[in-house]
Amino acid sequence: MNQYIEVKGARVNNLKNIEVKIPRNQFIVITGLSGSGKSSLAFDTLYAEGQRRYVESLSAYARQFLGRMNKPEVDYIKGLPPAIAIEQKVTSRNPRSTVGTSTEIYEYLRLLFARIGRTYSPVSGKEVRRCSADDVVAAALQHNPGTRFTVLAPLKERDDRTFQQQMEVMMQQGLSRLDCDGEMVRMDEAIESEASMLRYETALREGRLFLLLDRLAVDASKDGVSRLTDSVETALFEGDGECLLRFYPEKNLEHFSTRFEADGITFEDPSDNLFSFNSPVGACPRCEGFGKVMGIDEHLVIPNRSLSVFDGAVMCWRGEKLGIWREEFLRRAQLHNFPIFEPYFNLTEAQRDLLWHGGEGMAWEEGDVDVCIDGFFKALEMGQYKIQNRVMLARYRGKTTCPDCRGSRLRPEALYVKVGGKTIADLVKMSVKDLAAWFAALEVTEHEAQIAQRLLSEINSRLHFLEEVGLNYLTLDRLSNSLSGGESQRINLSTSLGSSLVGSLYILDEPSIGLHSRDTDRLIHVLKELRDVGNTVVVVEHDEDIMRAADHIIDIGPEAGRHGGQVVWSGDYRHLVESRTDNKKATSSESPLTSHTLNYLLGRERIELPTSRRKWNRKITIKGARENNLKGIDVDFPLNVFTVVTGVSGSGKSTLVRNIFYPAIQRHLDETAERPGEFVALEGDLDAIRAVDFVDQNPIGRSSRSNPVTYVKAYDEIRKLMAEQPLAQQMEMKPAFFSFNADGGRCEECKGAGTVKVEMQFMADLELECETCHGHRFKNEVLEVKFEGKNIYDILEMTVNQAIEFFDNYGKKKIVNRLRPLQDVGLGYIKLGQSSSTLSGGENQRVKLAYYLGQERAVPTLFIFDEPTTGLHFHDISRLLHAFNALLERGHSLVVIEHNLDVVKTADHVIDLGPEGGAAGGELVFAGTPEALVEAGKGYTAHYLAPLMNQNSTQHD
């Protein structure tokens, strides 16, 4: 078998006909500047060809149902195993998808509950069991030997016969005795007179009359057991699956049934579909398995959960007129020992239940609604003919937890079934860490262990892998569409680990996204585990720790775009350190090109510490942030400085910034913004901010027609310039003629795309150059219009750097000013007409940053960035920091969610959340300068930042 995956002549995107040997069954990192061609090699070449070969091996019939694969531009790839790509995208937008379903743990839980779950009656709390004759015999033998008892069968009234006729038929069948309240009665005596018939008929109606089949004493001998078994089987036959034993002298009754019933309720046999909220069998009928319904929104009724009922927590009970509801509730609260001075968030489930749904003695008056929140809204609904009542109802209506299933998404019958005393809804509310501990302590019988052994091992291994990839704070009922890209990718990674595939090529796109330095070590361990079972693991990555841990590094570069696409260095980093300790500059033995990666790893290049930190005196404060796992914290966000929010995965960074801080400021600036997460107050110098922008890594446009030059508004100026040329004016061409998105000047054959698609039935669609315009996108008469010898196609083919130089020479300052920010953020290598769909996540975010840099906003703006270093090399990060400084110099404010320690060390103010993830997080560990953070030594960020700060300070010295 080949020891290497050999790639020869790769020319995808900007790759320059490269050759590379990738060792198999090793852990390989592909790195390089943003836009250098890493993803082109990993995903567009290796993965695309691996997938294509697999699909090509299937029959033509099967292929027509699969997405057709393009063959990448490469001469050949030898030794390529089947490829699996795990990307950093949020994989599911489905509102039904949860962490449990996407990791398949929920499927195993459903099977576990269906196989070994025990059903308990909601009336008595006793276990519901289907009894056989052997179970009845075993129950009888539990009593002391010699104890007298009778075997009985229930009697039912019959519509088609009188009591007398019923007795006569049974006597003809050879039955002769009855049991009435423990006394034996002969059937012929029961019908000998009108009075006796009336008496026993009444007893039958009241369920006190039974058919007596045998009188016995507890006897464990063979004959005793045999006789008892016969009697029990007869009783079960006569009683239609029911049988009773009455023990003397107490006359106690024990009831047995072959049917699955108890307390007069017939229960459903547990099946795996009963526990599925995606199946009509198991889904709650009211919310149809979503867990939410349109109703009265708790967040709108109680916007400030830190207030008590006495202090006015219930918003709709404020005011002179409606305040009577609050007073009446307070008056009745003492009957139930309700704590009226306790903050709402501290109330128990039972206390909240009383406040929302009422209870005994809570009614206004007999037969009226209860004095509670539900009662208040019911009263409003009764008076809907009044306009003010309809307005009030509309004000508090929104998505709320389904009152029937309480958010469990399942029908009540599913929650009667328990394993280890817990329902399936209880388990999915636990964090992965707590659930793993619960399963480790779970005790099952020997018989149950045999049934559930495989299921339990699958559940435990998947929980273990979720812990290993740093997701121990997630709960299984967390919606997949609420996860970050990094969390989604690590869930996919843990699922891949759980599937135990061997001999495959795993290609991962920056798995360290969203991971704190503390969690990176565990991720490295997981990647090595994947390698050790016999897989080749290729990771596109910029994280220094992951690079140092790799068996092999491939550095693509040396720069980005058309200046990249070459293999700058390929080899083992550990050998490099040994052989290069004396070298001043890192160059490849294979190539004379400079490797920025190696220079950073060897300390030749670095991101410097700022000489001083910006001082601040204005701030915006979030008070009492309590959404998700936040513990009611107060956080100051300084203005006109560079603030970084950091903390381990799941500590509450996104909740604080994305769910509370950003929407709260939006709400302050514009009342129509979406509702922020739960907090008490937004205070501080709010007038100092006039606008807020949240910059994420989502694509600037999914269409192949979208491009960066349109996004930064430079194309408008270019089209105007072309329309001003003498030939264009002579032919009455307006600026729209120079757009490939509008009719007029574009080539109508390809609609301005430059290529036409030819559909092939079982093969990949072919994209061929348009024969009419030869890929130039415009009509010939439009291409004849030139500015200083360049037509519109020539201009779109220029890189940003070339265009700036060209337009600057001819004094076109407006266009240059629009394009300059793209150069400032390190995107000088991209073509003006390059499709946005070809840009990486990091490039997309920098195009947005360039747009803001080019806007010259007069109003002070707060910019919020969510992990801007994603997809960025060390070299790119230093450019990004320059762009950040440019924003700050214009009087704007900057808040960045970030784990990258090079960014953290350059911040003016650090907000560190933690100390752990999930329930153990959500607290403010530290707020201050990086120096003060390291000095305080609190939390994981301080621990990992300290060596970096010391290293830089020694280098400064």
Describe the residue ranges of each PLM region.
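Conserved phosphate-binding elements of NTP-dependent enzyme cores
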Residues: 1-957
